[in-house]
């Protein structure tokens, strides 16, 4: 078993079991593997919770964990001390100057913004950008990200969950309003017929079988498929975005 995978799971078990992502092949394991390459940068994790993702990043980086939950921020501070700065704030009003960050992480947050708009009856029908809270999040991220910066984004794919998650079209429309360049990937794709087996979580049965023959890193890397302009069935989206 990979050291990083085991270390992350142990952190959840030790510090916050209820915050675990619930899936050993979650797209956030792949996200962390990409973030580990970053050195000597200013990094903001929006909605970073107890700080698991930030804690896995290189110590040469200046890391800020932003969240609305005071309990999660307290937990992060107790576990990681001064290696991570913690700020209590909303995702729609980021308390930073323009062009402040080299890297910004927005992991499994947009679906929360969409849910807020649906429950608050804020959805703008017949508008290409119909979710105002999502638009505010992207507008703020664009403002505080440096011109040569990069946004790392993950969010569940609604084709799998069939709830208030984002669709491919909703996500790409929202990105294009504020950003010119992005690379989108479908994470953990699955065949159409597996929809019939959704309640059995069929999409994740294949990675579990592969684990008997390959290590965790090899499997999560194999689950990433490039966007070719056609929506695909997948569990999640992974996106790298630039101005």
What label would you give each PLM region?
Residues 50-93:
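Class I SAM-dependent methyltransferase SAM/SAH-binding core
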Residues 164-178:
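Short alpha-helix
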Residues 169-173, 183-243:
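A C-terminal cap/extension of S-adenosyl-L-methionine-dependent methyltransferases
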